[in-house]
């Protein structure tokens, strides 16, 4: 288990980014910490949160609480995602493509953390645009939010699932 991973109940949490930030005031700079935390159950539920505080543990705790509040459920096709999708947030853009079993998670740091927490085992990704960890995490979540299962698509189109799958 990595240094910045915690298994709490059935939720796995991982700190993706920690930064020291400064607010300039009359008397100088006021330092604090900003933490991006990803939380997931490894079975299709994942969330991300941002916490800010004067101390590191407090920033991580706030980020974890925020992530738990903003969890989403994603449809999985076995160990991968149902279809290709592009997630965008700010200047960050993440391309997510389904992969055949045994491929593994082909992704960079921040995107990998989100996908592993969600329980995706086989996927191909490409990060485009911003390489800011917070933007990449939120772009990945935006992409995962767009995913629809074959059943959902069939219901929306008013067609049988077999016709959608081909």
Swiss-Prot record:
Keyword RNA-binding tagged: yes
GO BP, sorted A to Z: translation
Source taxon at top rank: Bacteria
Gene Ontology molecular-function annotations: rRNA binding; structural constituent of ribosome
A GO cellular component entry from the record: small ribosomal subunit
Every S5 DRBM domain range: 11-74
SUPFAM superfamilies registered for this protein in UniProt: dsRNA-binding domain-like, Ribosomal protein S5 domain 2-like
Function: With S4 and S12 plays an important role in translational accuracy.
Subunit structure: Part of the 30S ribosomal subunit. Contacts proteins S4 and S8.
Family: Belongs to the universal ribosomal protein uS5 family.
Domain free text: The N-terminal domain interacts with the head of the 30S subunit; the C-terminal domain interacts with the body and contacts protein S4. The interaction surface between S4 and S5 is involved in control of translational fidelity.
Name recorded for this polypeptide: Small ribosomal subunit protein uS5
Originating organism: Symbiobacterium thermophilum (strain DSM 24528 / JCM 14929 / IAM 14863 / T)
């Amino acid at each position: 288990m990595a240094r910045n991973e915690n298994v709490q109940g059935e939720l796995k949490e991982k700190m993706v980014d920690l930064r020291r930030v400064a607010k300039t005031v009359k008397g100088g700079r006021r330092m604090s910490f900003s933490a991006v935390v990803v939380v997931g159950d490894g079975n299709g539920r994942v969330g991300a949160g941002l916490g800010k505080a004067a101390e590191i543990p407090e920033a991580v705790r706030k980020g974890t609480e925020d992530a738990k509040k903003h969890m989403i459920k994603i449809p999985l096709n076995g160990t991968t995602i149902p279809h290709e999708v592009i997630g965008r947030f700010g200047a960050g853009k993440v391309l997510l493509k389904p992969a055949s079993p045994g491929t593994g998670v082909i992704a960079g740091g921040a995107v990998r953390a989100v996908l592993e927490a969600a329980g995706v085992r086989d996927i191909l990704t490409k990060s485009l645009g911003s390489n800011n960890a917070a933007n990449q995490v939120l772009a990945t979540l935006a992409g995962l939010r767009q995913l629809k299962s074959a059943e959902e698509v069939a219901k929306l189109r008013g067609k049988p699932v077999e016709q959608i799958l081909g």
